[in-house]
Amino acid sequence: MAGVRSLRCSRGCAGGCECGDKGKCRDSSLLGKRLSEDSSRHQLLQKWASMWSSMSEDASVADMERARLEEAAAAEERPLVFLCSGCRRPLGDSLSWVASQEDTNCILLRCVSCNVSVDKEQKLSKREKENGCVLETLCCAGCSLNLGYVYRCTPKNLDYKRDLFCLSVEAIESYVLGSSEKQIVSEDKELFNLESRVEIEKSLTQMEDVLKALQMKLWEAESKLSFATCKS
């Protein structure tokens, strides 16, 4: 009929819809729309997931950096323990730190441990700009290593050094108190001091006495055997 528009469904069917069911065409259209919406939601979720993952990674990196800085700050706050480079005896710590002398390569401490022996023989300093300073030599009580000196008398311009212990950087080693990463004594270098030397010498003397006793018994046995041979 003229003037009657040809109706088409979503599949392109004309007239009364060759699909046979207008409801099915409508459902198909709605299904496509929902699939499109689901696809958009999926893309949006992926975008959010990507953004969240990126933010999580940034937060993780930030946390690691913060932890590293906190650990470094804590390490700086921990005191240093100064050891004799010869026998690893503790000599002092940074809690008694006064200053460092770059020109003489020394550190100045207010006090030291009992492992530092002070030679009471006084002598004048021969260092430049220390004219008039009276010094006493410092040695390690364990291995007798020369550690430095202590200022006993000073001119007026060096009064701040009086009674301070000056330890040579070359004669000492240090480690951070509470640090488990660094060993006080290296694996390939055993701790050797005066006490261990005395124990070793004592053991050697005992072994020597045992060897002498065995040698005497061997000599007696050889003498008896030789006498028996001659008699027969």
Swiss-Prot record:
The modification Phosphoserine is found at S36, S39, S40, S232. There is a cross-link at K161 (Glycyl lysine isopeptide (Lys-Gly) (interchain with G-Cter in SUMO2)). Keywords: Cell cycle, Cell division, Centromere, Chromosome, Isopeptide bond, Metal-binding, Mitosis, Nucleus, Phosphoprotein, Ubl conjugation, Zinc. Pfam families: Yippee-Mis18 (PF03226). Zn(2+) binds at C84, C87, C140, C143. It comes from the Eukaryota. The keyword Zinc applies. GO terms for biological process: cell division; CENP-A containing chromatin assembly; chromosome segregation; pericentric heterochromatin organization; protein localization to chromosome, centromeric region. One of its GO terms (molecular function) is metal ion binding. Residues 79-177 form the Mis18 domain. GO terms for cellular component: CENP-A recruiting complex; chromatin; chromosome, centromeric region; cytosol; nucleoplasm; nucleus. It is found in: Nucleus; Chromosome; Chromosome, Centromere. Signal peptide: none annotated. Its main location: nucleus. Coiled coil: none annotated. Homodimer, and heterodimer with OIP5/MIS18B. Identified in a complex containing MIS18A, OIP5/MIS18B, MIS18BP1, RBBP7 and RBBP4. Required for recruitment of CENPA to centromeres and normal chromosome segregation during mitosis. Belongs to the mis18 family. This is Protein Mis18-alpha. It comes from Pan troglodytes.
